[in-house]
Amino acid sequence: MGIVLKRAIAAGMKPFPNSTWHWSRTIRPFSQHLSSTCFLQQSSRFTSKRYLHLSTLTQQEKRFLPESELAKYKEYYQGLKSTVNEIPESVASKSPSLRTLHKRLQLPNELTYSTLSRCLTCPSAKLPDKINNPTKGAAFVNTVPTNKYLDNHGLNIMGKNLLSYHVTKSIIQKYPRLPTVVLNAAVNAYISEAVLAHIAKYWGIEVETTSVLSRYLKMEPFEFTLGRLKFFNNSLNSKDGIELITGKNFSETSALAMSVRSIIAAIWAVTEQKDSQAVYRFIDDHIMSRKLDITKMFQFEQPTRELAMLCRREGLEKPVSKLVAESGRLSKSPVFIVHVFSGEETLGEGYGSSLKEAKARAATDALMKWYCYEPLAQQEPVIDPGTVVV
């Protein structure tokens, strides 16, 4: 390095000129005697930028798909989009998921596989243009735009009305004296979103979670997509321990519940003329067959007062609480047994560690027997006057 500097100075050149080009030109003939590290450190800034620019372009070119592969992907995407928007019966009938679900639920033959696939397409699968614009790079990789005329929006509304009507009717026929608040709670316990979503999972409805690109790389047939539930959150990446809170129609629970309601509406649509009771039998088998303890839904704030008002409304004698038995009144844990009477008829009984507690439990027992009364099939329908106002 010293010899190089001496020759440069003898030639009338400064060792560190202002021009980077001169310095690089001076040392370039002797660069073969220098280490690569030293040469790179003294090289031109423009040369370094040019090298980085070329390397970046090379890396970008490596990431791009070949034109032929990109054309195949576009063709697959357009075919998938056309299939989802039209749902041809010839393609839907080949779906293993649809055929299995149809057989598992014992759906009528009039309900086609394309209609069943429509029940699994939520309206939220068609995203707004603001958040699904491929030209602006805002498209979701898992979402295929759907036809608004082939989603389950209308079926969901019809199925919700059918469920509300039949479940309410069944509960009132079984418990005609239920208060309105308890009746609404019982209906919600049968057909709430969480319950219907659990039923959908029990039926085996699958959710579409793979991206379109993954389906293309696997060359997945289009009928596989028709047999899965499609909704907004198909396009969101799930992370462990993080739950994204969005609109109700965008959650997986809402989408699963909508699919159940839509299937019920589809059954009614294809069997209403031939067998109008088929959809109600389906609801009884899959919805009303679950056990519900109606007694757990009651909570009385003033049971003795409410019982007195009930007896007055029904024309019964004023209820009277009587101590029937007791044990250990002066001990640490006494027990009192109280019965409540209306004339000579026993309405209810209760126990407790104090007379007040036993009296309240006896009144509660009498109210439960009244509200949870189940008439026999041979009896005339019972019409209750309404809720007791305390």
Swiss-Prot record:
Component of the mitochondrial ribosome (mitoribosome), a dedicated translation machinery responsible for the synthesis of mitochondrial genome-encoded proteins, including at least some of the essential transmembrane subunits of the mitochondrial respiratory chain. The mitoribosomes are attached to the mitochondrial inner membrane and translation products are cotranslationally integrated into the membrane. SMART domains: DSRM, RIBOc. It comes from Saccharomyces cerevisiae (strain ATCC 204508 / S288c). Component of the mitochondrial large ribosomal subunit (mt-LSU). Mature yeast 74S mitochondrial ribosomes consist of a small (37S) and a large (54S) subunit. The 37S small subunit contains a 15S ribosomal RNA (15S mt-rRNA) and 34 different proteins. The 54S large subunit contains a 21S rRNA (21S mt-rRNA) and 46 different proteins. mL44 forms a heterodimer with mL57 and stabilizes rRNA expansion segments 1/2 at a membrane-facing protuberance close to the point of attachment of the ribosome to the translocon in the membrane. Residues 139-205 form the RNase III domain. Pfam families: dsrm (PF00035), Ribonuclease_3 (PF00636). GO terms for biological process: mitochondrial translation; RNA processing. It is found in: Mitochondrion. Belongs to the ribonuclease III family. Mitochondrion-specific ribosomal protein mL44 subfamily. The keyword Ion transport does not apply. InterPro entries: dsRBD_dom (IPR014720), Ribosomal_mL44_DSRM_fung (IPR044443), RNase_III_dom (IPR000999), RNase_III_sf (IPR036389). This is Large ribosomal subunit protein mL44. The gene is MRPL3. Keywords: Mitochondrion, Ribonucleoprotein, Ribosomal protein, RNA-binding, Transit peptide. The keyword Ribonucleoprotein applies.
